[in-house]
Regions:
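N-terminal signal peptide c-region/cleavage motif recognized by signal peptidases
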Residues: 13-17
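Short, compositionally biased P/S/T/A/G/V-rich stretches that sit at domain boundaries
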Residues: 18-55, 138
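Short edge beta-strand/loop segments characteristic of extracellular beta-sandwich folds
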Residues: 56-62, 73
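Solvent-exposed serine/threonine-rich low-complexity stretches and specific carbohydrate-binding patches
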Residues: 80-93, 133
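Aromatic sugar-binding surface patches on proteins
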Residues: 91-104
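A short tyrosine-centered beta-strand micro-motif
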Residues: 109-121
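Short beta-strand elements
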Residues: 126-138
Length: 138
């Protein structure tokens, strides 16, 4: 009897879709310039934005499939400021998406703690919902 129960558990575990395991966040954060994948691959810390510099939220995600939707948002506190959404036309080993402003708003960025918010959906289901550590713009 125990053998049958274990066999059923193994079958159930094997039949669970691996979609959530396949997609993973490689990099997520905010910096003061538009980044390239090569820059993120080096693993060097990127400079944080300040109230008087550009601010770009970025996310690099691996294991995405055709039809997946990836969304990156630059957020101040609980207020979304700038958002970029992309639906993939084909499978992608890694995908970099950015949202932000390459210029500086008149008078600088408003006070607050900023973070990058990432959402990845597949077939209408949330695969990944993650935020970077909040940082103040000084």
């Amino acid at each position: 009897m125990l053998t049958r129960v274990l066999f059923v558990l193994v079958l159930l575990g094997a039949s669970v879709p691996a979609s959530a395991e396949e997609a993973k966040v490689l990099a997520l954060g905010i910096t003061d310039h538009q980044v390239a994948q090569e820059e993120l691959d080096k693993g060097v810390a990127l400079p944080p934005p300040h109230f008087n510099t550009p601010a770009i939220a970025y996310a690099s995600v691996a294991g995405l499939k055709k039809g997946d939707t990836i969304e990156i948002t630059l957020v101040n506190g609980d207020t979304p400021l700038l958002r970029n959404t992309e639906t993939l036309a084909e499978d992608s080993q890694s995908f970099l998406l950015q949202a932000g402003k390459r210029g500086v708003p008149a008078g600088g960025w408003p006070e607050g703690s900023y973070h990058a918010a990432l959402k990845v959906t597949r077939d209408g289901k949330m695969l990944i919902e993650q935020s970077s550590q909040p940082i103040p713009f000084d």
